[in-house]
Amino acid sequence: MPFTASDICKIILAIILPPVGVFLERGCGADFFINILLTILGYIPGIIHALYIILKY
């Protein structure tokens, strides 16, 4: 599946502020709150989780 312009924007946002990318992809659900927790505990795990969510869905 090719990347769209919105996917590229979400990836850039996920690198800068990971919860925003997850929120745009999945909304305000469990994935969003998991990503907030991961970002607080460590910035890199938050980025990895955000990229996983964006690339999976």
Curated annotation (Swiss-Prot):
Keywords: Cell membrane, Membrane, Transmembrane, Transmembrane helix. GO terms for cellular component: plasma membrane. Coiled coil: none annotated. It is found in: Cell membrane. The keyword rRNA-binding does not apply. Its main location: membrane. InterPro entries: PMP3 (IPR000612). The chain crosses the membrane at residues 3-23, 34-54. It is a multi-pass membrane protein. The keyword Transmembrane applies. Belongs to the UPF0057 (PMP3) family. Plays a role in the regulation of membrane potential. Could mediate a proton leak. This is Plasma membrane proteolipid 3. It comes from Gibberella zeae (strain ATCC MYA-4620 / CBS 123657 / FGSC 9075 / NRRL 31084 / PH-1). The gene is PMP3.
